[in-house]
């Protein structure tokens, strides 16, 4: 086989979609000479990263976990969101043996069922339809005490949009004639993923001990008070919902706890606080002996709790296939997206493959990334340039977090700076590749930074989008790019560029035609 250019670098610009509209489009507003030059001189197109094209419901915006799964698998991966929704529609959810075992054990002892999860129609980490179904299931199975501990979104949804979701669940419980919302707290606390354990502690103590900074007699009153304090949904402080004559809800021995987030990365820390016997990240006043703690999906193999929807193994994903062919690969990202470029890109596998190395660059310790829109991109780029110069790797996969993480802040000026930083970083990579004769593919996992304001409300747009994402070839070869590509087509494209045959399990189609 003739030698192919080396290395082949896959650059994933997280949250970097394409919008025809210049309005509140941080990419359009940024000074980006490198990006402009690439689009003027290199083969490029657009590919889809949302909806059915990535195994999500129609019209559902893509996200980082889903995007990286599809990119690495080389096939459309049927997402947990869709699996759970389908199980609810088919009725299988209500007989799920793992959830049923925990609920039935609590019911038999006249104990409570606690439902945890992000109460949101966002569909990124959870969906409120699933929380409604869980409340219905608990009631059907005879639970008299059903409590929802609602984590509020404002990140994958508009910043102040929780009220309809709270009202919907209040109505669900009213219709069941039992159960209620017991607490609300922003996802900033309950769903940390960066080992900021003081945040997780606030959520744990609210749920388990009923310890809250604030109390209110209804969920909507709790939310209104938070807004009056200047908090948006994501940052709502621990609030116990205590109707007149009631007490703050606590988790007691013999209760069942069901965590209804389907995405793993932001559910791990709180889960560990509940179930790890030797948990030491913060002191727990109470560690109740539960009838069961159920993860909706497997948040991590190391968490000692059952999951209702275990992973469906993927074989011959890109990383595995490269290893089988004796190829070397480097995965690199900063903390915020490290799991995506390793665990998710490898189809849900924690361990590196043979010949795979990983570099984790710490994300800056700032409260929100608009305060440092460059994040750790320059340091990530230093290591990539070094790796390209060494010519040790056949493939380098890198994630740049800026577009997504700064996009989520809703701060337009910071998002523009993030894009300008990315442009500089891409310039350094392209220059390094030019010197060694390497190639790159530049794409994204989903959109975000190209829409920074919600046109209908005038609020900051902090969520992902359904826009297509760019696909750019960087190199010396003559090739053409077809239209209609999806994220699942990227891995087959890489194999085409490397001269490797595509395995049968990869059902994606190469986006490029050589020659």
UniProtKB/Swiss-Prot annotation:
Q: Which UniProt keywords apply?
A: Glycolysis, Isomerase, Manganese, Metal-binding
Q: Which residues bind Mn(2+) 1?
A: 404, 408, 464
List required co-factors. Answer: Mn(2+)
Q: Name one GO cellular component term.
A: cytosol
Q: Which residues form the active site?
A: 64 (phosphoserine intermediate)
* GO biological process per UniProt: glucose catabolic process; glycolytic process
Enumerate the residues binding substrate.
125, 155-156, 187, 193, 263-266, 337
Instruction: Give me the comment on cofactor binding.
Output: Binds 2 manganese ions per subunit.
Which reactions is this enzyme annotated as catalysing?
A: (2R)-2-phosphoglycerate = (2R)-3-phosphoglycerate
Residue positions annotated to bind Mn(2+) 2 are 14, 64, 445-446
Pfam families per UniProt: iPGM_N, Metalloenzyme
NCBIfam families listed in its UniProt record:
pgm_bpd_ind
Subunit composition and interactions: Monomer.
**Protein family (similarity comment):** Belongs to the BPG-independent phosphoglycerate mutase family.
This protein is called what? 2,3-bisphosphoglycerate-independent phosphoglycerate mutase
* Organism whose genome encodes this protein: Pseudomonas aeruginosa (strain UCBPP-PA14)
- What is the primary gene name for this protein? gpmI
């Amino acid at each position: 086989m003739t030698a192919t250019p080396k290395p082949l670098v896959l650059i994933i610009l997280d949250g970097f979609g394409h919008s025809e509209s210049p309005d509140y489009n941080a990419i359009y507003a940024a000074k980006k000479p490198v990006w402009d030059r690439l689009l003027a001189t290199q083969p490029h197109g657009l590919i889809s990263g949302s909806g059915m094209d990535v195994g999500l419901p129609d019209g559902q915006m893509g996200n980082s976990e889903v995007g990286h799964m599809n990119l690495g698998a080389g096939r459309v991966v049927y997402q947990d969101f869709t699996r759970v929704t389908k199980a609810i529609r088919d009725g299988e959810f209500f007989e799920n043996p793992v959830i049923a075992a925990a609920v039935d054990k609590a019911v038999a002892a006249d104990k409570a069922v606690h439902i945890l999860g992000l109460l949101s129609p966002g569909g990124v980490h959870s969906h409120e339809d699933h929380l409604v179904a869980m409340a219905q299931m608990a009631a059907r199975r005879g639970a008299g005490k059903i409590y929802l501990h609602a984590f509020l979104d404002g990140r994958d949804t508009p910043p102040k949009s929780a009220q309809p979701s709270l009202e919907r669940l209040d109505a669900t419980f009213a219709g069941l004639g039992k159960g209620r919302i017991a607490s609300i707290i922003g996802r900033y606390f309950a769903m940390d993923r960066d080992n900021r354990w003081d945040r997780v502690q606030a959520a744990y103590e609210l749920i388990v001990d009923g310890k809250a900074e604030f109390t209110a007699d209804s969920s909507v009153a709790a939310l209104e008070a938070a807004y009056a304090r200047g908090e948006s949904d994501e940052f709502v402080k621990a609030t116990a919902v205590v109707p007149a004559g009631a007490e703050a809800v606590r988790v007691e021995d013999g209760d069942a706890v069901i965590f209804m987030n389907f995405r793993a990365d932001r559910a791990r820390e709180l889960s560990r606080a509940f179930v790890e016997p030797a948990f030491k990240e913060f002191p727990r006043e109470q560690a109740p002996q539960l009838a069961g703690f159920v993860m909706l999906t497997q948040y991590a193999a190391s968490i000692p709790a059952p999951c209702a929807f275990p992973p469906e193994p993927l074989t011959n994903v890109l990383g595995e296939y490269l290893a089988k062919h004796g190829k070397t690969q480097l995965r690199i990202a900063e903390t915020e997206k490290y799991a995506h470029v390793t665990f998710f890109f490898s189809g849900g596998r924690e361990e590196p493959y043979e010949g795979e190395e990983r570099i984790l660059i710490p994300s800056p310790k700032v409260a929100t990334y608009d305060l440092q829109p460059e994040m750790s991109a320059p340091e990530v780029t230093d290591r990539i340039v070094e790796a390209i110069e060494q010519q040790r790797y056949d493939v380098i996969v890198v994630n740049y977090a800026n577009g997504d993480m700064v996009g989520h802040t809703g701060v337009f000026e910071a998002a523009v700076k993030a894009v300008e930083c990315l442009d500089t970083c891409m310039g350094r990579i392209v220059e390094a590749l030019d010197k060694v004769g390497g190639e790159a593919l530049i794409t994204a996992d989903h959109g975000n930074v190209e829409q920074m304001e919600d046109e209908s409300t005038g609020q900051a747009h902090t969520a992902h989008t359904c826009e297509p994402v760019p696909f750019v070839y960087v190199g010396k070869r003559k090739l053409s790019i077809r239209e209609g590509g999806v994220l699942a087509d990227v891995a087959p494209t890489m194999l085409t560029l490397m001269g490797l045959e595509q395995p049968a399990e990869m059902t994606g189609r190469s986006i490029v035609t050589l020659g």
